[in-house]
C-alpha cells in the first residue's frame, strides 16, 4: 500500500488499473444472467464480502469459461483481497498469470477484429493492472513497458465511448489527469508533451456520465469524482455526495468509510464521526487502524480539544504506518499536519516545526500542502 512518486504515465495508468471488466459485446450483453452475476460479484468485492464474491465468480466461470472479463474480474477480486500484493507471495504469481491469460484471449479476439471495443477495454485494463503490480514491487522497467502498451489502448478508447459507456471512466480520467497532474507537479510537464491534450472540465463530465451510464465502472467514477473534488479541486462540498454514496452503498468497505471521514473533517462536520472512526481503529488490519488513529487525532484535537490525547493518536498512527508497509504519503501529510498543528497549540514550536515539514514533504496535493506551509511560517 505504500505509494511513491511515479511518472505521469504510471500515475494515470494506476487510475485505469481500477477499471472493472465491462461486458458489452462478445456474446455477454445479451446474457442478462451474466450481467446480473457480474454486478453482484463486483458489489460483493467492493463491500469486502469475499465469500459471496467467490460463489458468484464460480458461477460466471461455469457459464462463460475463460472469457477475459471473468479473468479480469478475478484479478479485481485479488487486488482487494490481497492488497498489497508482494512479489514473494503466491498471490503475485496468480495475479500475473490471470492478467497474462486475459491478454492472450484478447489478442485472439483482436486478431479477428482489431477494433473490437470490449477486447480493447479488457487489454487496456490488463496492462494497467500489470503496470501497477510491477511498479508497486520495484520492477520499474517492466512497469513502464506495460504502461506504454496500455496507453495505445487508451487512445483507441476515445473513439469507442459512444459504443461502450465503460470508456467514460478511463477517458474521463485521462482528460482530467493529463492536464491536472503536471499542473500540480511541474517537473513532469516536459515528460508528457507527446501525449494528446486533455480537458479537465470534459474529464469531470465524462466521469459524471460514467457514474450514471456505466454498468461496471460507475463505482470508480464515483470514487474519482470524490477524489478530484476533495483533493485536487479543493471543493469538499462537491465531493461529499460521492463520499456519502460510497459509504452507504458499501458499509463494510473501510476505505470508503475513511474517505467519508476525511471529507467531513475538511468541512468541519464532526457529528456522527466517532463511531466510524472507532470502526477503523477496531479493524484487524494495521492499514485501517493507521487511518483510524489519524482521524481520531483530529477528533480529539478539534472536537474534544484534548491535545495530549490527539498527540497520542497521531503517534500511534505514525507507529502503525511502519507496520506491514502500510504507510501512504497522502495520509502521512494529514497525520503530520495535525501533529504539527497540535504541537503548536501546546507551545512546542520545535516539534511543531519538524512535524509540519514532514507534512509538506509527504503532501501530494496543493490543497493539503498549502495549509501546512502557511502554518509553518506563522
Question: Where do the model's predicted regions map?
Answer:
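Alpha-helical adaptor scaffolds
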Residues: 221-231, 258-268, 277-282, 288-328
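TPR/TPR-like (Sel1-like) alpha-helical repeat modules
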Residues: 151, 155, 195-199, 204, ...
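TPR alpha-solenoid repeat register
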Residues: 70, 119, 167, 220-221, ...
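Short coil/linker segments at helix-helix boundaries
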Residues: 34, 44, 48-54, 76-117, ...
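"A position-specific structural signal for the A-helix of alpha-solenoid helical repeats
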Residues: 39, 73, 80, 122, ...
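Residue signature of alpha-solenoid helical repeat architecture, marking inter-repeat boundaries
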Residues: 31-32, 65, 70-72, 114, ...
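Solenoid-like repeat scaffolds
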Residues: 25-28, 59-65, 160, 192-197, ...
Amino acid at each position: 500500500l505504500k505509494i511513491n512518486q511515479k511518472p505521469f504515465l504510471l500515475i494515470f495508468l494506476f487510475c485505469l488499473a481500477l477499471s472493472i471488466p465491462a461486458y458489452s459485446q462478445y456474446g455477454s450483453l445479451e446474457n442478462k444472467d451474466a450481467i446480473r452475476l457480474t454486478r453482484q460479484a463486483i458489489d460483493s468485492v467492493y463491500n469486502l464480502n469475499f465469500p459471496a464474491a467467490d460463489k458468484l465468480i464460480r458461477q460466471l466461470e461455469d457459464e462463460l469459461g475463460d472469457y477475459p472479463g471473468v479473468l479480469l474480474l478475478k484479478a479485481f477480486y485479488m487486488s482487494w483481497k490481497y492488497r498489497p500484493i508482494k512479489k514473494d507471495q503466491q498471490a503475485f504469481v496468480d495475479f500475473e498469470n490471470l492478467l497474462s491469460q486475459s491478454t492472450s484471449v484478447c489478442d485472439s479476439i483482436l486478431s479477428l477484429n482489431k477494433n473490437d471495443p470490449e477486447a480493447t477495454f479488457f487489454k487496456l485494463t490488463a496492462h494497467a493492472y500489470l503496470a501497477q503490480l510491477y511498479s508497486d514491487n520495484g520492477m520499474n522497467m517492466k512497469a513502464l513497458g506495460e504502461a506504454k502498451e496500455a496507453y495505445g489502448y487508451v487512445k483507441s478508447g476515445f473513439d469507442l465511448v459512444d459504443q461502450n459507456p465503460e470508456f467514460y471512466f478511463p477517458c474521463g480520467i485521462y482528460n482530467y489527469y493529463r492536464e491536472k497532474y503536471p499542473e500540480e507537479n511541474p517537473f513532469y510537464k516536459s515528460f508528457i508533451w507527446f501525449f494528446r491534450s486533455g480537458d479537465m472540465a470534459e474529464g469531470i463530465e465524462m466521469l459524471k456520465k460514467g457514474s450514471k451510464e456505466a454498468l461496471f465502472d460507475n463505482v470508480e467514477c464515483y470514487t474519482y469524482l470524490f477524489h478530484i473534488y476533495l483533493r485536487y479541486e479543493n471543493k469538499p462540498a462537491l465531493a461529499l455526495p460521492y463520499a456519502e454514496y460510497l459509504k452507504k452503498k458499501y458499509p463494510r468497505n473501510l476505505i470508503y468509510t475513511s474517505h467519508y471521514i476525511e471529507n467531513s473533517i475538511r468541512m468541519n462536520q464532526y457529528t456522527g464521526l466517532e463511531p466510524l472512526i472507532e470502526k477503523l481503529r477496531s479493524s484487524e488490519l494495521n492499514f485501517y487502524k493507521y487511518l483510524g488513529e489519524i482521524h481520531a487525532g483530529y477528533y480529539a484535537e478539534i472536537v474534544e480539544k484534548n491535545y495530549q490525547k490527539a498527540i497520542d493518536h497521531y503517534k500511534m498512527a505514525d507507529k502503525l504506518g511502519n507496520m506491514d508497509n502500510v504507510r501512504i504519503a497522502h495520509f502521512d501529510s494529514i497525520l503530520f499536519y495535525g501533529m504539527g498543528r497540535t504541537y503548536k497549540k501546546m507551545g512546542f514550536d520545535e516539534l511543531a516545526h519538524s512535524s509540519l515539514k514532514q507534512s509538506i514533504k509527504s503532501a501530494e496535493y496543493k490543497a493539503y500542502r498549502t495549509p501546512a506551509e502557511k502554518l509553518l511560517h506563522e
